Amino acid sequence: MPFEPGDGRRSVSPLSTGRASPALRAPRRVEDAVAQKDKTTRRYATAIDRALSSFDSAQQEWADYIAFLARLLKALHPPPPALEYLPHAQSVALRLAQCLNPALPSGVHQKALDVYATIFSFLPPPSLGQTLHVYLPGLVPVLSFASLSVRPIFYSVIEDHILKLDSEHIRPATKSLILSLLPGIEDETSEDFDRAFRILNVLRKTSSRDIDDGPDAEGRDGYFWQCFFLAVITNPSRRQGALAFLTRKLPNFTPSETSPDSSQVEDRTLPLAAQAAINPEPGLLVRCFAAGLQDSQILVQRGFLDLLVTHLPLHSPVFRNHVRSKDMVLITTAAASCVLRRDMSLNRRLWSWFLGP
């Protein structure tokens, strides 16, 4: 029986969505209103729609993708003055994502990234930030299959446009951006390792800067680390690259040497950066390490055991004052399961963590 107005029964719907950050998506009706703003904008929207209609996914060779992208790029130039939102943005993003299919040659990928860069260049930063969720799904997997000629263009798109946005626009996309950049630092000997690592570190500072607190400072990168831990937990294929970043940038959770007694370690003995990394959910750090210790690749297990020994010893205040008992059981069980590998290098690191220095 449906509820009647005034029958005294309360609705089970929540009063709010509980979001900590605002919903930044631009409604479709806003884009439609922009498209109908004036004659120039309507003509611009018609040209884009005509270029999109020339895309036929059922009967295309790779050369046809190049021709389609050239037509789309021609339709995008020049944009009308004071353009706020790109007309038919969702359709454009869909076609660009299809042009970034791993089965297509690198020439198509380069052309598609050029179109992304063109769109991002003439959209105002607030508008790009509000519509970033439309374009990002096509960009996220690029580094996992990109050739050496495509990677610099991808890095330029991230550096020149996305990382220039305010932190309030980058925060909702932080985890996706982390996952998109981790393949670039999997091989520490690759020629683009330094650039990918630098971009990821800039993302750490940009996304973690408090919106109202001014410049970045120590202890304000907790939001980035929480997203990073989630990325490691949910994406086994990205853990090799994540390990390279953790080895260089993870805060040390070892108690201060000046503490009077290691059995009475207080919160203040943790550095500010370490306190930020476990706020508001210290269990994410534990589950991140547990996921790495149970990875199918022995090199990943070895790397996370090294991090346990150097950054997260058993006498750390994290285990004593922050995590729950079931989280402690989880990471101990995950570490102990490494002996099933019957690998001496893993066993040696495990005993170092259990027995201490």
Where are these regions (language model features)?
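Short domain-edge segments at the starts or junctions of modular domains/repeats
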Residues: 32-39, 48-60
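HEAT-repeat alpha-solenoid elements in large eukaryotic scaffold proteins
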Residues: 18-29, 55-79, 89-96, 104-120, ...
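Fungal intrinsically disordered, low-complexity serine/threonine- and proline-rich regulatory regions
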Residues: 1-44
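Conserved tryptophan-centered aromatic signature that marks the ligand-binding surface of SH3
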Residues: 296-304
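Core helices of alpha-solenoid repeat scaffolds
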Residues: 40-51, 85-97, 124-139, 170-179, ...
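Alpha-solenoid ARM/HEAT helical repeat scaffolds used for protein-protein interactions
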Residues: 81-83, 122-127, 164-169, 209-213, ...
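Glycine-rich flexible loop motifs, especially short His-Gly-Gly/GGXG/HXGH segments used as catalytic or interaction
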Residues: 290, 335-339
